[in-house]
Amino acid sequence: MLEVLKTFAVLYVGLFAITNPVGAVPIFMGVVSHLAPDKRHEVAEKVSITVLVTLLTFALVGKWIFKFFGSSVDAFAIAGGILLFRMGMEMLSGKLSSVKIDEEDVTLEEVAVIPLAIPLISGPGAITTVMLYMTRESPPIVIATIIAIGISVYIILASGNKIIEKLGRVGIKVTTRMMGLILTSMAIQMIINGIKGAFGI
């Protein structure tokens, strides 16, 4: 049981760093700041459900994607590690997402899906990670991790106002840098594991 909890904690911290919902708070609040609290919570719920469904879908069909494209898990780990390393370096610089939203032609429901849920939170890095998790870890633990991330996304976005009040943009940048450090170390390890597997080292 202790080993299961340890694995869950490691996977959760890694996926939380990649999705970085705290870093998405300023953009989320910029879109919903004019809404009543209950409406903000509705949008946060739509974002979290979309994140959950997206990550679960790719986690469950990932092995067929590998087969279809004739890609090995090790090759995918190397490519994914490079992608995550780049993301981690951007986060280490304290860069907040530069996703732009044109509010004139879209509804809040559409914004909740694109770009807030995809690709801001459940982007290529998160999708790559859950697919690799499923090949290397116990599927029930991976699924539990994804569900926990979905719940975390909702709680953080629904509390966006309080988070900005407590942390401010500087605090959010510091948090983003911390997540970037975790992500960069994960990426390097992913690349090392991929190289070892590919060359039988």
Curated annotation (Swiss-Prot):
Q: Does the keyword Membrane apply?
A: yes
Source organism, top-level taxon: Archaea
* TM spans (from-to): 8-28, 49-69, 73-93, 111-131, 140-160, 181-201
Describe its membrane topology: Multi-pass membrane protein
Q: Which Pfam families match?
A: MarC (PF01914)
Q: Which GO terms describe its cellular component?
A: plasma membrane
- Print the keywords alphabetically: Cell membrane, Membrane, Transmembrane, Transmembrane helix
Q: Where in the cell is it found?
A: Cell membrane
Record's family?
Belongs to the UPF0056 (MarC) family.
- PANTHER family with a match to the protein in the record: UPF0056 MEMBRANE PROTEIN YHCE
Q: What is this protein called?
A: UPF0056 membrane protein PYRAB13050
Task: Name the species this protein comes from.
Answer: Pyrococcus abyssi (strain GE5 / Orsay)
